[in-house]
């Protein structure tokens, strides 16, 4: 199953034809047509049709870029959402309030049937869960160890977790994530690594703070995240740049790969006076993969 490019994943309200039309020119790697939080209760059913029509119309132009965030599996909307939006052109489902990997397996079985009905090749529709939005989910993060069908990445969220536990804020007085959310961030990274998929960082809420977003993305990439959720169209380009390796990083990575290719039996090498061993080779290959 091929990897999707997930540096930037932009939410677009699925009930807004104007915003959907405008999103087609956005540089985000993935557009997430949102049926959950950004759509009012009274408009959810209609938004399904709007989303499905948009996917069908844009299938060729936006190939492998269209996801839908459905409503949580334990709501009355989830199955109807899936039945409406699994059409040719859909690349993936973002699953909010995922409780454990068991939810991914359940969703995957549903997608098996819906792909067959829609004439879509088996396994086409991938899944990105939001894996930290409830206390139960936090305690089940170890369930993502190993290969999971359709899993394309794992992301995390702070807002719903705050509401569940009754936190007044998810930041300390100095503006840093408080310990619970630092844990959620770290568990997302570890779960994604254990599952062999990219970890996608949560959104930067202040869409006017471009400098803060860029700094947060750079720090996130240093920690191991491969992309970030965007809540505003202007964030996509900033996110893409931050999660893409620089020319200097690519050149250094290529030197490491070339050095080991020239001496395949070596356990460690010296480059510019620095000892380089197999973990450095792994990181170099990952860096080159990011630019592919």
Indicate where each model-derived feature is located.
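Expand to "…catalyze enediolate/carbanion chemistry for C-C bond making/breaking, isomerization
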Residues: 1-292
């Amino acid at each position: 199953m091929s990897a999707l490019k997930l540096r930037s994943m932009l939410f677009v309200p699925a009930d807004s034809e104007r915003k959907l039309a405008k999103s087609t020119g956005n540089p985000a790697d993935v557009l997430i047509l949102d049926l959950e939080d950004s759509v009012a209760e009274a408009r959810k059913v209609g938004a399904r049709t709007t989303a499905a029509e948009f996917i069908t119309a844009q299938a060729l132009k936006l190939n492998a870029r269209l996801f839908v965030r459905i409503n949580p599996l334990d709501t009355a909307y989830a199955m109807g959402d899936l039945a409406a939006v699994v059409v040719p052109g859909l690349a993936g489902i973002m699953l909010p309030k995922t409780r454990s990997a068991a939810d991914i397996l359940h969703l995957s079985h549903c997608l098996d049937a819906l792909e067959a009905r829609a004439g879509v090749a088996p396994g086409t529709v991938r899944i990105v869960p939001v894996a930290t939005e409830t206390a139960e989910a936090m305690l089940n993060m170890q369930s993502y160890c190993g290969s999971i069908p359709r899993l394309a990445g794992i992301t995390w969220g702070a807002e719903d977790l705050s509401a569940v536990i009754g936190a007044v804020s998810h930041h300390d007085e100095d503006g840093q994530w408080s310990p619970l959310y630092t844990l959620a961030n770290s568990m997302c990274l570890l779960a994604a690594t254990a599952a062999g998929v990219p970890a996608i960082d949560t959104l930067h809420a202040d869409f006017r703070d471009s400098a803060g977003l860029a700094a947060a993305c750079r720090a996130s990439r240093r920690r191991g995240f491969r992309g970030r959720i965007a809540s505003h169209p202007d964030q996509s380009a900033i996110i893409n740049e931050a999660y893409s390796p620089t020319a200097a990083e690519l050149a250094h990575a290529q030197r490491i790969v070339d050095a080991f290719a020239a001496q395949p039996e070596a356990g460690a090498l010296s480059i510019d006076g620095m000892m380089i061993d197999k973990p450095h080779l792994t990181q170099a290959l990952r860096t080159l993969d990011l630019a592919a």
